[in-house]
């Protein structure tokens, strides 16, 4: 299968790439940071020689980069799976955060998925099959202090995912929203939170991979995951 994963150089994106690479699939991955992407690509190819790893630097907060990345993926074939993972978390209070934070969070966390999907999904529609995963967040489901514009952008991403599900279900295309709680990535380093208190990125990757193993007539609409002891 041809699997497209955005924001795949670290964290959940890299863990998802590993889950599909170990199964020998062909991957198209991207990251905003070229050096991290190069390192991730080399690591994946070395660890999983039976997989084929294609990579391209792209800043998906920019529509032009979404279109360029999408067209590049299509030049390699029709994707079977699209995992919209690109984005970032910036904590803050709505009345105190810096000017333009909302715009940057919407661009990174919503527009990236919107424009990348618009570039790739028409080929899936033509093929009559495909599976799209949108990496939302627990912050898509309820508000919390310091959620700020990040939470707003993730609520919007949930709306995008739900609408996409309704539009594509009669075209043979599955859409799954993924709602992870606290997951240990580099952003937690130095936070004082023990890694054992929160989930591993591999936990989310395993659930995403499992959701792709169902019959064509079955879909997991939502994957909600939290640390065993609950949200922080």
What is the meaning of each model-derived region?
Residues 9-11:
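Conserved glycine-rich cofactor-binding loop
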Residues 117, 153:
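Active-site helix of classical SDR
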Residues 93-94, 98-106:
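Substrate-binding pocket helix/loop in short-chain dehydrogenase/reductase
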Residues 23-40:
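Conserved glycine-rich Rossmann-like NAD(P)H-binding loop of the short-chain dehydrogenase/reductase
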Residues 137:
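Residue(s) in the substrate-gating loop at a strand-loop-helix junction
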Residues 177, 193-232:
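C-terminal helical subdomain
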Residues 34-35, 57-68, 99:
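The beta1-alpha1 cofactor-binding region of Rossmann-like NAD(H)/NADP(H)-dependent oxidoreductases
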């Amino acid at each position: 299968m041809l699997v497209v994963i955005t924001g795949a150089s670290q964290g959940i994106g890299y863990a998802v790439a590993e889950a599909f690479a170990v199964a020998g699939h062909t991957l198209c991955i991207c990251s905003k940071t070229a050096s991290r992407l190069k390192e991730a690509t080399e690591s994946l190819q070395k660890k999983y020689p039976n997989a084929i790893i294609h990579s391209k630097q792209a800043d998906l907060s920019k529509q032009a980069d979404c279109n360029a990345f999408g067209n590049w993926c299509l030049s390699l074939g029709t994707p079977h799976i699209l995992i919209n993972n690109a984005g970032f978390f910036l904590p803050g209070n709505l009345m105190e955060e810096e000017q333009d934070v909302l715009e940057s969070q919407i661009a990174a966390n919503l527009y990236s998925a919107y424009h990348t999907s618009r570039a790739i999904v028409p080929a899936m529609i033509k093929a009559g099959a495909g599976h799209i995963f949108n990496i939302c967040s627990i912050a898509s489901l309820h508000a919390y202090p310091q959620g700020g514009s990040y939470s707003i952008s993730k609520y919007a991403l949930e709306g995008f995912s739900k609408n996409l599900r309704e539009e594509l279900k009669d075209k043979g295309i599955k859409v799954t929203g993924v709602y992870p709680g606290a997951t240990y990535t580099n952003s937690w380093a130095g936070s004082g939170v023990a890694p054992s208190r929160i989930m591993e990125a591999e936990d989310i990757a395993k659930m995403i991979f499992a959701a792709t193993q169902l019959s064509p007539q079955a879909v997991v609409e939502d994957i909600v995951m939290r640390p065993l002891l609950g949200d922080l």
